């Protein structure tokens, strides 16, 4: 190559995987890609543990870069919740790509579990609903919206716990904003009013939770995109049609009613959510109470109507394994 040849000075940025290898991570393997990042499974050598590292790829625009920082901030404020994925570390590669380190969950997501194994049993879905409603409620108490509650964002741990992940498009009150009218979630799990151009709200997260439970019970989304269907046509069905009746799938009346209400097209009077933003978490709290009561009856049918044995709304969220007590059989299998 001759002197002064432009190829002689051309520089190619190293891959994120290669850079992670120089940041204390070993056995770096790509395990997934999202709208704005790549996820790697790595070994964190200094702590002898396997972790998942989400890296913001260099080719993404500033909007998606800002979205990644929103995830860091939101997830940091929620660290410690038993049903929300924890952040273990944040950093940046030598070329400036930011990353977050999270626990690695080989059990995969709820979406993968349903796709591979079909619908979950009623008691599993009720347990899932109680815990996810508690997770969303906790986020709402901090003024945080998830904006994309769906099966793919619920990870299943080795300890039998569901954990809500990917607050990458979350909104923190007083912080970052998303342009009104921009749909940043997954259409089949996005509230009708958001598809119509309204900004996301706590009620929209309640809708996403209801749509997720519908999918877990039936094996498919209530308004799943049909083969050959245009996205506009799918939007039209979501915004104009009633939610399919879960009783036709053999789901009890009370459970069907809770999910139908959570997925109501009316975000104010239809969903279990008062209009005052100060009490926005009550929407998920009401859903938790309904699901927790039904879950209690499914598990303890002989205790129906025994007064003192009725569970409180938060009881289901407290039924957690002791820290460090590994379960031999996952309830998701």
What are the residue ranges of the model-derived segments?
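Conserved short submotifs of the Hanks-type protein kinase catalytic core
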Residues: 95-109, 113
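AlphaC helix of the eukaryotic protein kinase fold
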Residues: 57-78
């Amino acid at each position: 190559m001759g002197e002064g040849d432009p190829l002689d000075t051309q520089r190619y940025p190293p891959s994120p995987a290669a850079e992670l290898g120089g940041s204390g991570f070993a056995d770096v393997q790509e395990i997934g890609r999202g709208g704005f990042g790549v996820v790697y499974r790595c070994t964190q050598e200094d702590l002898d543990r396997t972790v998942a590292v989400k890296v913001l790829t260099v080719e993404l625009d500033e909007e998606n870069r800002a979205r990644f920082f929103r995830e860091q901030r939101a997830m940091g404020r929620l660290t410690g919740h038993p049903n929300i994925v924890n952040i273990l570390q944040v950093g940046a590669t030598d070329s400036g790509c930011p990353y977050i380190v999270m626990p690695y969950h080989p059990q995969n997501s709820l979406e993968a579990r349903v796709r591979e194994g079909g619908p979950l049993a009623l008691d599993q879905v009720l347990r899932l609903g109680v815990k996810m409603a508690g997770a969303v409620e906790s986020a709402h108490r901090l003024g945080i919206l998830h904006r994309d509650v769906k099966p793919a964002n619920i990870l299943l741990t080795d300890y039998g716990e569901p954990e809500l992940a990917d607050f990458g498009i979350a909104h923190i009150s007083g912080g970052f904003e998303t342009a009104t009218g921009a749909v940043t979630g997954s259409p089949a799990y996005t509230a009708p009013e958001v598809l119509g151009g309204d900004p996301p709200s706590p009620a929209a997260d309640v809708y996403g939770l209801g749509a997720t439970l519908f999918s877990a019970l039936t094996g498919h989304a209530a308004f799943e995109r049909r083969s050959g269907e245009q996205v506009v046509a799918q939007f039209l069905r979501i915004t104009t049609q009633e939610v399919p009746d879960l009783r036709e799938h053999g789901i009890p009346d009370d459970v069907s009613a809770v999910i139908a209400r959570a997925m109501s097209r009316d975000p104010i009077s239809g969903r279990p959510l008062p209009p005052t933003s100060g009490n926005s978490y009550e929407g998920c709290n009401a859903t938790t109470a309904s699901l927790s009561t039904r879950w209690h009856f499914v598990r303890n049918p002989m205790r129906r109507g025994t007064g003192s044995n009725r569970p409180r709304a938060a009881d289901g969220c407290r039924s957690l394994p002791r820290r460090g007590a590994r379960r031999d059989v996952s309830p998701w299998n």
